[in-house]
Structure formats: C-alpha cells, structure tokens
Amino acid sequence: FWDGRAKHLAEQAGGPPLNPVEMGMKDKASVVKRIAENQAVKDYITKHWGEEIWQDDEKIYAIMEQALAAFQQLDLFAQFSSKYDRTLAGQDKFTEQEALGKALFFDKEKTTCSNCHQLNDKDHREETFTNYRYFNLGVPKNEALIAHNKLGQDWVDNGLLDNPMVKGDIAQKGKFKVPTLRNVAVTAPYMHNGVFKELRTVLLFL
C-alpha cells in the first residue's frame, strides 16, 4: 500500500477482498465461501489441511493470503523482459530519443529522476525503478476521487502518518511510497491518488 500499512506481501494480499471500493466482500466468511466454489482449490486445501479446516474461516483466509503472496513472488511477475532490459543485454537498441531519455533519467544533478526511482546505482539490470522509500511531494488533492468516495471537502489523506506503525510522527504526514516506473506508460492515472491523467503532467509537476 502507498502508506506502507501492510507489513508483508501476505498481509497486503488480504486487503483488497474486504475493501468496499475494491472487491467489496462482506467478510472473511464470504470470501471463504467463494473460494470453496472452486472445486480444484477446495480439494487442494482439503488434501493438505484436512476437512476440518473448512470450519475455520480465519485459517482459510490466511491460506489464501499466503498462496497469493507466494504466487506474486514468482519470476512471472518480474520477468525483466522489456526493451530496456533487452537493450542492457545487448538484444535490442534504443532509438535516439530513447537514449536521450535514459541519459536524462539517470542524471544525478539535473533531472534527478533516479534519486528516487532507482534501487541499485551500481548495476542497472533487474532494476525495479523505486527505492521503496516514502516522500511528501505536495501532490494536489484529487477532488473527483474525494467526491466519489463521499469523504467531504475537508478530508486529507495523511499517508504514512495514518500508518499505525508510525505512531503519530507528524514528520511523516503526506508521505507516500515511491512507485515503480515499470510499465508506467500504461498505468495511468498517476500519483498515489490518481490526480494526474497524463504522464507529461507528472513531469511538469515535478
């Protein structure tokens, strides 16, 4: 999550099913009931944990979280097979404009993009394009999102400050996790609240 409230991937996986604006399931029991509708999944769980496991919604939900976390850590989710990766491997070439963009991106003095959007400054292979840290960029409110969720005009997204693990450190107010730039051209809208519709707007803002 952008505010870092999930301690690990399994905990994050358990969030969306019960979130009213994502999957909107009523409770864990409802999710477990839906899981049981898939006979192959039900048979697998029964085989490994026994028939009695279906009497414990909490345990089934935890199994789901762990399974999703394990799946999301497969190389399938990070194949590093983009044109950028192929070029580093000598299997492709950047256009002149792309090469200029790369030079600007990694410029540590002028554009400074890679100050936040780079994990390893010694080896650009298998780069995730985020340092996984948190910053307050002063991103404007997304009024449309606030209205849609009926939060009220005075509502403020405090970001990291609302994370229970931060414990009221006011210096963390408005900070959000640096996102990866992998597939950034096709993942609009942008910023933690989706306030910018176009990538060019992000560049002008920053």
List each model region and its residues.
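Post-cleavage N-terminal segment of exported redox proteins
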Residues: 20, 29-99, 103, 107-108, ...
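Detector for methionine-enriched segments
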Residues: 23-25, 64, 165, 191
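Glycine/proline-centered hinge or cleavage motifs at structural transition points of membrane proteins
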Residues: 2-37
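Secondary-structure transition/capping residues
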Residues: 20, 24, 79, 112-113, ...
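Short glycine/threonine-rich turn/loop motifs
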Residues: 1-14, 83-205
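Intrinsic-disorder/low-complexity, polar/charged segments
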Residues: 8, 27, 55-56, 198
